[in-house]
C-alpha cells in the first residue's frame, strides 16, 4: 500500500469504519452536551482534532524517552498543555462560543479518544503517522458531532448556524420548534440511531451473538 493510500485510510477509516463514537463508543458525554448548535459542534470538532493530532505527534516524538511508569502522566501533561492553548484562544477570539462550550473544552484533557490514541497509537508509531491518525480520529469524532448537531439545531430551533432555515411560527411561518431536541436525551437517541444506520451500511461492525 502506497503512502498516499495509508494517509487516506488513516484519515477516512475513523469516520465510518472505525468511528471513535459510533464503533468504540468513546467521547459520548461531550457529544451529548455540545451538539445543541452546529456552531458549537463545529468548534468542538476543531478543538478535539487539534489536540488529538498535536498530542499524538508530541507523544510520538518523545515516546522512546518516556519511562513506562510515568507514561500516562506525561501524556496527560502534553494533552493538558494543548487544551489550555485551545481554551485561551477560544476565550480571546470566540468568547461567546467559549461560554457555551463551558467546561467541556477543559474536559478534552480526559477525553477517552485523545488519551486512547496517544496510548494505543502514538506510543508505538512514528510522529507523522501519529499526527495523521490524530487528525483522522478528530474528524471521526466531528462527523458524529456535526451530524447530531445538524438535526438538533434544525428541528430544535428551526435554524442552522443561528440562521433561520425553517419558517418559525413566531415569525409568521409554519414550523413550531421541538424543544425536546435541545435536551441531552435527544442527542443520546440520535447517536443510537446513527450507530444503527452505520451498522446497516457496515454489517461487519455488528457484534457476533454469544
Swiss-Prot record:
Membrane topology: Multi-pass membrane protein
Localization (cell): Cell inner membrane
Catalytic reactions on record: a ubiquinone + n Na(+)(in) + NADH + H(+) = a ubiquinol + n Na(+)(out) + NAD(+)
EC number annotated for this UniProt entry: 7.2.1.1
Keywords from the UniProt entry: Cell inner membrane, Cell membrane, Ion transport, Membrane, NAD, Sodium, Sodium transport, Translocase, Transmembrane, Transmembrane helix, Transport, Ubiquinone
GO cellular component: plasma membrane
Regulation: This reaction is tightly coupled to the Na(+) pumping activity and specifically requires Na(+) for activity. Inhibited by korormicin and 2-N-heptyl-4-hydroxyquinoline N-oxide (HQNO).
BP GO terms, sorted: sodium ion transport
Residue ranges crossing the lipid bilayer per the database entry: 42-62, 72-92, 103-123, 131-151, 178-198
Top-level enzyme category: translocase
Record-level Gene Ontology MF annotations: oxidoreductase activity, acting on NAD(P)H, quinone or similar compound as acceptor
Disulfide bonds, paired cysteine numbers: none
Family: Belongs to the NqrDE/RnfAE family.
Function: NQR complex catalyzes the reduction of ubiquinone-1 to ubiquinol by two successive reactions, coupled with the transport of Na(+) ions from the cytoplasm to the periplasm. NqrA to NqrE are probably involved in the second step, the conversion of ubisemiquinone to ubiquinol.
Quaternary structure annotation from Swiss-Prot or TrEMBL: Composed of six subunits; NqrA, NqrB, NqrC, NqrD, NqrE and NqrF.
Name this polypeptide is given: Na(+)-translocating NADH-quinone reductase subunit D
Organism: Vibrio alginolyticus
Amino acid at each position: 500500500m502506497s503512502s498516499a493510500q495509508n494517509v487516506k485510510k488513516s484519515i477516512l477509516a475513523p469516520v465510518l469504519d472505525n468511528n471513535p463514537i459510533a464503533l468504540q463508543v468513546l467521547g459520548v458525554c461531550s457529544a451529548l452536551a455540545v451538539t445543541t448548535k452546529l456552531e458549537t459542534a463545529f468548534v468542538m470538532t476543531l478543538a478535539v482534532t487539534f489536540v488529538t493530532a498535536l498530542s499524538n505527534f508530541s507523544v510520538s516524538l518523545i515516546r522512546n524517552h518516556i519511562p513506562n511508569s510515568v507514561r500516562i502522566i506525561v501524556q496527560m501533561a502534553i494533552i493538558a498543555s494543548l487544551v489550555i492553548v485551545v481554551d485561551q484562544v477560544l476565550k480571546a477570539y470566540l468568547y461567546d462560543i467559549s461560554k457555551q462550550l463551558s467546561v467541556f473544552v477543559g474536559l478534552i484533557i480526559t477525553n477517552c479518544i485523545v488519551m486512547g490514541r496517544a496510548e494505543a497509537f502514538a506510543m508505538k508509531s512514528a510522529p507523522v503517522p501519529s499526527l495523521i491518525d490524530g487528525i483522522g480520529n478528530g474528524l471521526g469524532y466531528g462527523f458524529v458531532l456535526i451530524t447530531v448537531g445538524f438535526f438538533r439545531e434544525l428541528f430544535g430551533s428551526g435554524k442552522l448556524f443561528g440562521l433561520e432555515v425553517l419558517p418559525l411560527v413566531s415569525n409568521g411561518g409554519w414550523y413550531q420548534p421541538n424543544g425536546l431536541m435541545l435536551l441531552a436525551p435527544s442527542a443520546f437517541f440520535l447517536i443510537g440511531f446513527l450507530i444503527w444506520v452505520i451498522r446497516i451500511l457496515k454489517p461487519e461492525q455488528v457484534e457476533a451473538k454469544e
